[in-house]
Amino acid sequence: MKQIQVRKVPYGETFSVFGDKFVALDYINGKVLAIRKEIWKNAPFDTSGVNDLRTASITGHLVQYFEDLCKNGASEDTVTMNVMDLKATDGSREYGTFGMRAGLLTLEQYGKYQDIIPLADDWWCLATPWRTPNPGGRRSPSTDVTDGVWSVISNGDYGYWDAAGTCGIRPALYFASDLLVSIEDEGEEDATDGETALYQEYREYIKEWSGLETVMGESPLTFEDWKNDRED
């Protein structure tokens, strides 16, 4: 294993920090968005069947997860606030936004990053409500499917999930960009059958890029962007 700044981890690649493994997704406002590589644990989104993350029981588990990371060296300086947009499927913003150190991806974020997020072995929850009781200030609030949240199936598809049902928790976090994390060094693993010469060349690009004096805020190209740039 070797250590590099988390902002230098290619999107879609796995890194280790604070005793856990994550997949780098994006560089946003000076922070690196990442998701836990695998499901952490299973629990209801909310034991009362309410799809509002601001009051949902799942937040207690997410707080516990961050506390566990802190036992392994994390802090509020290295794991910044994840402010989630709780916009419902129809675009209503009755629930507003909600911030936690360890949060969940939204449906919109999953749609953006799904191609680089590893599949999990079970369903896992997203932060996005299926719909909310009073979108647009209705005079008669509805309870129809307001117990539903979006979730991701083990094959990568996504759909409706009852908030009271047990589902996987896969925390999403924003890391300080200069945080040192560990990645697997090329010399420590044998090439797998699925690795092509092109991907090996990409790994060399990452290795060289990591050793350069880069400007704060820069990150390496994703594999797809690197391929496209190479072909131009």
What are these regions (language model features)?
Residues 1-187:
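Collagenous Gly-X-Y triple-helix signature in extracellular proteins
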Residues 189-232:
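Acidic, low-complexity, intrinsically disordered interaction modules
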